[in-house]
Amino acid sequence: VPFVFSRIAVAVLLVLGAVAGPAASFAAEPVAARPADPLPPADSTQAAQAAQAAPVPCAPPPAGASLTLAQVRLDAMRCNPTIIAARRGVEASQADVQIASQRPNPVLSLGVENINPHAGVGSGNLRSKTVDSTLRVDQVIETANKGNLRVDAARKASAAAGEVVQAVVAQQTGVAEQAFFEALVSQERVAVLRETLALYERTRQASETRLKAGDVARADVTKLQLDALRAQNDMRQAITDHYRDKAMLAQAMGVPGTLADNRLVADWPALDAAVPQPDADTLQRRPDVTAAEARLAAAAASRDLARAGRVPDVTVGAQAEHYPTSPTNSYGSGNSFGVFVSIPLFVRHRNGGEARRAEVDYYAALDDRNRVLLEAGNEIDRLRSQLETARQSLRQMRDEVLPAAESVASSAEFAYSKGATGVLDLLDARRALRQTRLDATEAQGEYAKALSAYRVALQTSTTTGAPVASQARP
């Protein structure tokens, strides 16, 4: 009898080993060697976009190469880590859709019972042994349309992730443009100070010649030298600031290095550049607004799913049982079958906490949508006013202030060369011209940044048929 019992145990172990063997080998297989479950694109257009989205190593521009604003935008869209993280979020949300579409798997149960070592299990083959063997399959049946609601919530969350990508792209490319113009301003500042130093060098040579001739005093030459030293110190600080600004630009682009060997191309916008006018739908189609709307729609779908959780799921099962009789066991029933239904009893709770949390999340998403909508409208008005102020300041600087400062400096240079004025008047005129040129460069940068920020604020989502969560029922 023990021998027979051991044979039965060995047979059961062999069956379990046959079932567990492939699973164990699959689990032991290296992750890199297993192909990932593909997420089939919805159409050929998405397949082409997925092929074009192959990762390309992000590298800084070659040393000595010029860097344009267009190249900055392209590198930022390709290499900016925040944009990359947002795109990973879209991929994760697509996987969530696949997960949500998976229905519960059936459960197979195999069992052997009523094994009596003392009475024995009878003679004959395994099928004739007087043991009660059971084969059972159970399947969970989701009620209240939970499966479709779960897929709907996942799809709306995926749509929200897509809108978030567009909002992040608009924001981060705008940050890169701001960093580009900031670095360009510091580059122009270095150029202005370099021209000033060249002027001081020419004046020094002329002053030494006049000093030898006795036309100027030694004190005047010393004053010129001191002012030139101050200008040199200003230029060193400007160079340091320019390197810092280019390093910040590289960080905004997402490329390694500091762009120390790259010169920026002065892509200044024209003073009369066309400024887009917002229409009635611009605010509603901004990427951050559409992202908030999509998050609200996803929260509404999740709330519906949580409400459906109050209805219990049903588990149905079918069982086949084999319990033969023998001279030592007359209680066998032969082959018998059975069906089962299992329903959880909502005695202690009805998943009310989940439903309440989903309700709170919905209203939090609604508040966030309203906040984003309000801030977007205020931002457009504020940036419009800021742009007009920067445009007027730059026009005044170009048309009035800078020509006047250049005229005064030119007159002072001429008068000093003829001995009609002293060195202090010359230095005052030069300081005024230098500061005016620096202010003009700053005004140019402020106008460029204001125009860039305003254009970013007016960007609209390119997604067609974006969900309108404001229509979700309360």
Identify the residue ranges that each predicted region occupies.
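Short, charged, amphipathic alpha-helical segments
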Residues: 151-155, 218-227, 423-431
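Amphipathic alpha-helical coiled-coil segments
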Residues: 85-100, 168, 172-195, 202, ...
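Hydrophobic, lipid-facing positions within transmembrane beta-strands of outer-membrane proteins
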Residues: 131-137, 335-341
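Small/polar (Gly/Ser/Thr/Ala-rich) solvent-exposed segments
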Residues: 84, 107-128, 141-167, 187-189, ...
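Bacterial Sec-pathway N-terminal export signals of envelope proteins
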Residues: 26-112, 131, 140-141, 149, ...
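Periplasmic alpha-helical coiled-coil/stalk elements that build and connect Gram-negative outer-membrane
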Residues: 168-285, 386, 390, 450
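Acidic, low-complexity, intrinsically disordered peripheral segments
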Residues: 1-7, 12-13, 24-46, 439-474
